[in-house]
């Protein structure tokens, strides 16, 4: 790669993306790419019967008709743009999509777009894997430098860093040269948007999942503009009014230091549970507690949950009086109360947030900042749970890493169990088995139809 000092940030990222080749990817990055691809598809299949997903499919069919790319879980084909948008929203809906400790949720903004465009253009599995890996690297160059400021300002990364990374993914799939990839990235900067107000208004809006769709659509649009010859600002990232300044606290060349040396996709994590990733360590710590002994829930005096700052703030993460399933999926008091009662945290468990047995425990929960766990963040994302009974018995559970993190990765059997749970009933059993096997073979396919045909309902 050319010396970073001779390039601005846009050029440097575009140069890396345009020159990345499949053979440059380490085996772990290829393995994770296969898992990310199948995981994203199965997350979408699991959401197939929900109201929002049906609405998205109807909207995409009306506004983006075509025969280029499959709407997963259906026998409908749409334009590549329509399928990418709808599949992105759908794969995000259950909140079981992948989760990187620093970059956040990445796959929903990149994988549906890459698959739709590769399907449209008859590209191979190796090309798909390489494009997705490049998109993760873009995310990794952009998101960490603004992450803290985003959280303080209530901004959402999916349609911000997600839009920029999607622009590069689209440009690569469209075969654009380095200069046009750079322009796609630069043009997408002014399309980046999105807040987390949807959490406070959960149940009253659909924005959480639409943000992934916005990223896909805007990223693709930016690439189309670049392909047509439009130019974006060279300082779109590191300029005085560029992205790092607008969404963060300014540019630091160290933001780009890992490009070409570290592959972000190899560091991503996966969600074995539903709901927000920041509550998952609480799920695992509670299950760790239950493995050591089941407290009599009718005799619980108090429950204490200790975690890191990002897991306990802002206020919706410690909300006691949730009005909707969407709010409940972010609430630590609800999480620990549900898992103590049910032992799991899937969509059907979160939906039980208002049951009497759960609500009996919620007021007894105290959420605190655990100083040691907070000091370890973001290298670790742990949680500690304590349950004290009226007789003084103490039950404790602790994890240093949520299940699915690189240091506590799901086993192949656990991955397959998740995939089967999500895809069950959406596609034939033989297709589910073949899709599970795609984790290790997706790079070997010659045409994207070999993958997307497995998502058909029959």
Language-model segments: residues:
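Flexible glycine/proline-rich, aromatic-decorated loop/lid segments
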Residues: 187-196
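Well-ordered alpha-helical segments within folded domains of soluble proteins
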Residues: 107-115, 160-169, 216-221, 281, ...
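Terminal-appendage/accessory-domain detector
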Residues: 1-104, 203-217, 224-458
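Well-ordered alpha-helical scaffold segments within catalytic/enzyme domains
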Residues: 47, 114-121, 167-173, 222-226, ...
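Structural helix-adjacent loops and short alpha-helical linkers that scaffold large soluble proteins
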Residues: 120-132, 175-182, 231-235
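Structured all-alpha helical bundle cores of eukaryotic regulatory proteins
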Residues: 150-153, 158-161, 181, 188, ...
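Aromatic-lined, polymer-binding surfaces characteristic
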Residues: 138-164, 212
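Hydrophobic alpha-helical hairpins/lids featuring a short glycine-rich hinge
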Residues: 91-144
């Amino acid at each position: 790669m050319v010396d970073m000092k001779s390039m601005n940030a846009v050029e440097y990222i575009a140069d890396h993306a345009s020159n990345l080749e499949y053979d440059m990817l380490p085996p772990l990055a290829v393995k994770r790419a296969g898992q990310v691809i199948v995981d994203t598809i199965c997350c979408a299949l699991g959401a197939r019967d929900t109201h929002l997903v049906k609405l998205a499919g109807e909207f995409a069919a009306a506004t983006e008709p075509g025969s280029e790319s499959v709407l997963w879980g259906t026998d409908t084909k749409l334009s590549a743009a329509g399928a990418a948008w709808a599949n992105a929203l759908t794969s995000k809906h259950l909140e079981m999509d992948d989760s990187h400790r620093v970059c956040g949720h990445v796959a929903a903004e990149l994988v549906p777009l890459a698959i739709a465009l590769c399907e449209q253009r008859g590209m191979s599995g190796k090309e798909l894997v390489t494009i997705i890996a490049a998109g993760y690297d873009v995310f990794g160059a952009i998101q960490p430098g603004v992450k803290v400021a985003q959280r303080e300002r209530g901004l959402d990364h999916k349609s911000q860093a997600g839009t920029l990374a999607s622009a590069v993914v689209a440009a690569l799939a469209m075969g654009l040269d380095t200069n046009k990839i750079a322009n796609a990235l630069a043009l997408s900067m002014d399309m980046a948007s999105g807040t987390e107000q949807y959490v406070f208004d959960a149940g009253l809006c659909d924005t959480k999942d639409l943000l992934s769709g916005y990223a896909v659509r805007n990223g693709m649009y930016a690439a189309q503009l670049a392909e047509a010859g439009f130019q974006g600002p060279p300082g779109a990232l590191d300029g005085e009014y560029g992205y790092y300044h607008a969404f963060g606290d300014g540019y630091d060349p160290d933001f780009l230091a890992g490009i070409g040396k570290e592959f972000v996709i190899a560091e991503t994590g996966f969600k074995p549970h539903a709901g927000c990733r920041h509550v998952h360590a609480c799920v695992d710590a509670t299950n760790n507690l239950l493995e050591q002994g089941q407290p009599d829930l009718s005799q619980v005096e108090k429950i204490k949950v200790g975690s890191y700052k990002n897991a306990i703030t802002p206020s919706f993460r410690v909300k006691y009086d949730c009005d909707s399933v969407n709010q409940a999926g972010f609430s630590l008091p609800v999480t620990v109360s549900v898992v103590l009662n049910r032992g799991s945290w899937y969509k059907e468990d979160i939906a039980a947030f208002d049951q009497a047995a759960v609500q009996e425990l919620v007021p007894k929960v105290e959420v605190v900042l655990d100083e040691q766990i907070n000091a370890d963040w973001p290298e670790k994302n742990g949680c500690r749970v304590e349950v004290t009974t009226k007789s003084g018995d103490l039950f404790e559970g602790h994890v240093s890493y949520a299940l699915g993190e690189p240091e506590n990765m799901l086993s192949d059997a656990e991955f397959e169990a998740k995939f089967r749970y999500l895809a069950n009933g959406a596609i034939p059993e033989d297709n589910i088995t073949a899709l599970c096997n795609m984790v290790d073979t997706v790079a070997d396919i010659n045409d994207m139809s070999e993958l997307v045909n497995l998502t058909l309902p029959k």
